[in-house]
Amino acid sequence: LVFSYAEIIGLDVKLWRDSVGAPLNIQPVIERLMPKDKTKPPVNYDLRINNIVVRRSRLSYDVKSKAEADRRFDRNHVEITDLKADILLPRIKNDDYVIDVKRLALKERSGLEIESFGGVFSASTSRLSVSGLRLEMPSSLLEFADMEVTYDGWRELADNMFNLPADVKLLDGSHIATSDLACFVPVFAGMNRRVDVSFDMSGPLSDVRVRNITAATYEGDMRLSLSGRVSGLPDVGN
C-alpha cells in the first residue's frame, strides 16, 4: 500500500495523567487498538508513505499532581508549539521499518528551540541503525557518525538493551552554545559561549569505553580532553 502525500495542519494534541504512573487520558483509545486475542498471529502489512508534512501543530503533556518548574524544562509539563516536520516512510512492514526524518522543528515553553532534527532510522528483527543524525539549535550543531546495533530478535533487544555494544561518535565541527542550554541550566541565561565538542565511545551502555571526549571554547581560552571507561550507567540513580 503506497501513499504519495499526507498533510497534517493545525494538529493540537493534549496528553495528561493525574499522577506519575497513572494511565494517560488516551488509555481507552490505546486499549481499543490492542488485539483482543493475543494468541493470533499478527496481521501482515506493507506500507509506504512518500511524504508526510506537519505544520503549525502543538503537543502538550502534563502530570497534574506535579507543580510546574520555573524558567527551565520540566518533563512533567511539556508544551510544544510551532511543530513542523517533513517525514518519509519508505518501508513500514512486519518486522522491518525505515523512517526518514528530513526535518523536525519545534519550540518548547521553557525556551528550548530545535530548528532542525533529522536522520534515517531503521529497525528489523536483527539490526537497529541510525544514519545522518543531525541536530540544529539556534546557535548549536550536533552531527553524529552512523550507528548500528545488532541483536537476535525483538526479545533480545527489549531484555538486553543496555548490554548490546555500539559505537557512538560525535563528529568534528559539532558545537554547543550555552544560550541553547539555558532551559536546562538557568544560570546560562544571558551567557553566549560556544564550546566545540566531539567524542568517540564504544561498548554497551553498562560498560562504555571512552576513546576520547574533547571540548574547547571557540575563543580558545579553555580545552578539555578525556578518555577512560564508565561502568554501571543503567544503575545510576537506583
Segments (PLM) and residue ranges:
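Short, intrinsically disordered, charge-balanced linker/junction segments flanking boundaries
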Residues: 1, 231-238
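Secondary-structure transition motifs
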Residues: 1-95, 112-114, 140, 144-151, ...
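Transmembrane beta-barrel domains of outer membrane proteins
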Residues: 46, 122, 200-202, 227-231
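Transmembrane beta-strand segments that form the barrel wall of outer-membrane beta-barrel proteins
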Residues: 100-104, 128-135, 207-215
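Solvent-exposed loop/turn segments connecting transmembrane beta-strands
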Residues: 108-114, 137-143, 216-224
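Short sequence motifs at beta-strands and strand-loop junctions characteristic
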Residues: 111, 189-193
